[in-house]
Amino acid sequence: MRLHYRRRFNFLRRILFILCITSLYLSRDSLKLHAKNVLMDHNVAEYHGGMIDDIQILRCYHWYRQCSSLYAPKLHPSNTAKKIKDKNSILWTRVSKNITVETLYSLQSGPFYNSYLYVHLKDFQSNPKNTIKELAIARDSALIPLQVLRDINKLVKSSDSSVFHNHVYLREKPTSSWWKLLFGISVDTDNIAVFGEEWVYKGSGIWCKYILNDDDNDAPITNLEIYLGSSFIESRPSWKEVIHEFHRNNIPSLPISITRKLETKNHHHKFSNGLLGSLRTPSKDINIQVDADYKITSPHIQFSRGQRSFKILQITDFHFKCTDNSMTVINEIKTVNFIDRVLASENPDLVVITGDLLDSHNTIDYQTCIMKVVQPMISNKIPYAISLGVSDESNLATSAQIRDFIRNLPYTFNNVASEEGHMAIEVSFKKKLTKNTLLERDIDTEDETNPSEALFFVFDSFAPVNNFLQDYNDLIGKIDFGLAFQYFPLSEYRPHGLFPIIGQYNERSTLTVDTPRSRGQVSMTINGKHYKSFLDILSLWNIKGVSCGHEHNNDCCLQSKNEMWLCYGGSAGIGLPRIQGIYPTVRLFNLDDILDEITSWKRNSNLVDEVYDYQYIYKGKQ
């Protein structure tokens, strides 16, 4: 009996050994890939831009050394499975998302892996042939995106097209499904047939169009970005969403939006800001230098024709979180709509954002939150400048990453900010006018005097200003008037005794802000003279007023000792804690070169179409 069991055991052991050897042989390609990814260099960078010739959703297993890049086979579309076999693996780079928790933007997950979006960079970046020029992603891999169906419908109407050819796209299945669950690379093994030759199926619901020859004038895709959260809207020129708010069924987290950018020609040009369509004021013609990606390249704004005034909208304190909380999402949508309505009513020439776009550690995706804030300005081609606040930080990103993202946005003056984050925006009117010219219809261009100059400082509250201001000594005595903006209030915002005030002044406690300017500790020597007052320093450039954010329950303007008005921008975020009777508010300034005056007023979300607290910030002696 014992011999009988021993023989049976030896037989089973041989069978098991044969099965193991067979399984290892069949999965040898997958094992090689896994070994390659386990041992690969961890310093390989993620995808931050460049032309691509392939894109896939790939699994990154927990035992891989890193997920920034990995080796995987390339998918080849064909009519038969035999033609798509590719034993050689290529290096794929993951589409970058500058947050530290990788699982937040994984497209799928399993007990042993997370799936991400990967691309293959084209070898020769100078030649766009065989690169991807358009991209569409379906919410379900068994469905075809609407954009693809629309293009197919166009081809159906053409009897001489190749639409009647049946093309099947397959992915090789070298191993069994249970073994691939552990060791496979690909996520999707669909076989999908589509009529037409333009769109190519890449698996996992991804469809691509390629530049097939040198005569194709379409621009290639040069960048991809991922955004987390609801109510995201892509408004940047040359960018387009390829999938909007994709909800990952097996991951209880925020929806994902993926956007793509097309190549732009490398040249500089000018743009004239203003609202689109019938809302745009025809008399406005403001020239601002921007590059091919509409990033501002010069801090100088020049007026042409008869424009004689300059309007600034100050918005501050949004505290966007971009979480999955429904009330938070609704309030953020309402806030963006509020800003949209103000822009439609006022059509400002410049928007200054004085901090707290984010809500510190409560914010998940800082990029989505910032894009929500600036979307109204980008859509309306209105330039803007951002001064960061104390809440503009995130547990998932560094301060440098946040600032770098803002600098690369279109229409922002942050691209020309100093190393410390300060900005000086110069505005030149075509010529200096007086009240007498109000009655003149035609002005002789030969009698023009020097242009009128205005200057707007946008300071970073956390950085020193001494070196920055020294760079603008040559403008002292040449500026007609100007304004300064920053996030924190100055020490002069807490005056003693009686003082003029217009608006709500509810937070009057001692400033707890720990910056030299807010403590009144300023020391600077300019042109041989020593100054200890920041307001006295600003007056050298004829700055007539300062405006800040930070305090949600203050929206007033109060007058300082040297007759300079110190203002608050209110707080724009709907749903923020405020005392009763205080609504989300924005402040506007208008500089009139003819009347030689600066005026200010406010609008709030309760009565957007009405203005209130209209006042003079500066009134000349003409």
UniProtKB/Swiss-Prot annotation:
Involved in the activation of the plasma membrane proton-ATPase (PMA1) by glucose. Pfam families: Metallophos. The lineage of its organism: Eukaryota, Fungi, Dikarya, Ascomycota, Saccharomycotina. Induction: Up-regulated by ethanol. Residues 1-27 form the signal peptide. Keywords: Signal. GO terms for molecular function: phosphoprotein phosphatase activity. InterPro entries: Calcineurin-like_PHP_ApaH, Metallo-depent_PP-like. This is Protein SIA1. One of its GO terms (biological process) is proton transmembrane transport. It comes from the Eukaryota.
